[in-house]
Amino acid sequence: GKTTTTSMITTALELAGRDPSAVIGGKLPLIHGYGKAGKGDDIVIEACEFSETFLKLTPYLSVVLNIDNDHLDYYGSMGELKFAFKRFALMTQFMIFANADDKNTMDVMYTLDRRVRTFGIDNDGDYQAINVQEYKPGFFEFDLKEWSKVTGHIRLAVPGRHNIYNALAMCAVCR
């Protein structure tokens, strides 16, 4: 999800004419590579929790899509992994965008004294996908609800229900 979300955010900023810099874990055709040095003020970085590399960053905004069993060989326990995410969140300067449907993520967010905005499908987040429909096998569309108002309709060109979360994160960040 990190690469897709980073790509979606970079694409949205590009299409808005903001010319962002980007470091992405996968190739984004729009920018012809894995990253670019833009002339705008925005920098989009795909951060990874492996060996605490994300703790070297001090983001202005951050997105937490989920906290799952990845890298428990390094952290030793889910508690230690959650603590690393808490430290990452505390280094965020302005706002954290968090998946309201991921219990581990919300366990961490509830402990913070930071500005947090949530997104999700099942739980009532600040940004929520409602009226989710599969318009062809594996591809989804939905209405975007921001706070309590429907503000648009999104039809994803990438397959998988998980990409609804990636798109919600992009919408929240780019708002």
How should each PLM-predicted stretch be described?
Residues 1-100, 104-115, 146, 168-175:
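Phosphate-binding loop of NTP-binding sites
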Residues 133-150:
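Acidic-glycine-rich active-site phosphate/pyrophosphate-binding loop
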Residues 22-26, 100, 113-135, 155-161:
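Beta-strand->loop->alpha-helix junctions that form or flank phosphate-binding loops
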Residues 41, 123-125, 148-152:
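Short acidic/polar mixed-charge low-complexity motifs
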Residues 136-140, 158-169:
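Short glycine/threonine-rich catalytic loop with a Thr-x-Gly-x-Asp
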Residues 71, 150-154, 164:
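Short small-residue beta-strand/loop micro-motif enriched in glycine and branched aliphatics
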